[in-house]
């Protein structure tokens, strides 16, 4: 088990042995979105870990989960509105002389994402992806491209094996660009962008973190605007802001 204590480490591309942090991992007790009248405030949290199979083989298995908890919705017993489950496996290709400023590394993988709900709220998709990335000093540029594995759209609407969301890429596009930059005094800004030029839809997200209480914790500001913040509402434009704490960034 490894938690990066270096304040300038990027968890996504860190090559720690065994179990380690992966994507942003945070707890945001206070978030606000005007998209959900009567339930504007939700607790948003994510968990994300990866496991390297062997020190000499850069094969990783990873699991990420993002949850939306309506902690203030007492009239409905404070439900979890949505959980998104995201297991994946990927192989990391890195040049031997990775210290050179011009080097590119690449992740090649397969991932599944679903929300575990029953019809008509079930959402899921599977993707093959390639993600070249450039990392030098205090900058990381990670550009992920994917191909969705086709599902059967001809099955009846009540069949759970039917494609739940055949148009999801109209809202997510086929690529995501992530840029992370270390700033002064170990502050960090992380932004991500998705866009489909055919439909004109996409999203932009931002996470700003500063060193917080204790080693490995960071005060966090979160902002998102666009589509597919969650699978359930992939086709609804959402604007959300939130504050909390992170352990991976």
Task: Locate the predicted segments by residue.
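Outer-membrane pore/translocation modules
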Residues: 39, 54-185, 193-199, 219-227, ...
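Predominantly the C-terminal beta-signal and adjacent terminal strand-loop region
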Residues: 201-249
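Extended aliphatic helical segments
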Residues: 43, 47, 53, 57, ...
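Short, well-ordered amphipathic alpha-helices
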Residues: 47-49, 87-94, 205-208
